[in-house]
């Protein structure tokens, strides 16, 4: 059975962000605006997205 995936795209720069936000962006595999990654849709990923919700765009794949 196939797991749900979400596409996370960084839309804003992390400049001026807190250490926690910078670490979360790095943990998600992002780094620059317009970078995108596909991750499993689980509680861990949703928690990370919540920390940087103002910097990313999320869509289901």
Swiss-Prot record:
**Gene Ontology CC:** cytosolic large ribosomal subunit
Q: At the top level of its lineage, which domain of life is listed?
A: Bacteria
| MF term (GO), any | structural constituent of ribosome
Is Ribosomal protein tagged as a keyword?
yes
Q: Does the keyword Flavoprotein apply?
A: no
Instruction: Could you list this entry's UniProt keywords, alphabetically sorted.
Output: Ribonucleoprotein, Ribosomal protein
The record's annotation in InterPro entries points to: Ribo_uL30_ferredoxin-like_sf (IPR036919), Ribosomal_uL30_bac-type (IPR005996), Ribosomal_uL30_ferredoxin-like (IPR016082)
According to its UniProt entry, the protein's GO biological process terms are:
translation
Q: Name one Pfam family in it.
A: Ribosomal_L30
| Transmembrane segment boundaries | none
Subunit notes for this chain? Part of the 50S ribosomal subunit.
Family designation:
Belongs to the universal ribosomal protein uL30 family.
**Could you identify this protein by its name?**
Large ribosomal subunit protein uL30
Q: Which organism's genome codes for this protein?
A: Chlorobium phaeovibrioides (strain DSM 265 / 1930)
Q: What are the top taxonomic ranks of the organism?
A: Bacteria, Pseudomonadati, Chlorobiota, Chlorobiia, Chlorobiales
């Amino acid at each position: 059975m196939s797991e749900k995936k979400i596409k996370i795209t960084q839309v804003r720069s992390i400049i001026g962000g807190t250490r926690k936000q910078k670490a979360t962006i790095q943990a998600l595999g992002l780094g620059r605006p317009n970078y995108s990654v596909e991750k499993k849709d689980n509680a861990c990923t949703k928690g990370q997205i919540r920390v940087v919700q103002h910097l990313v765009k999320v869509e289901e794949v």
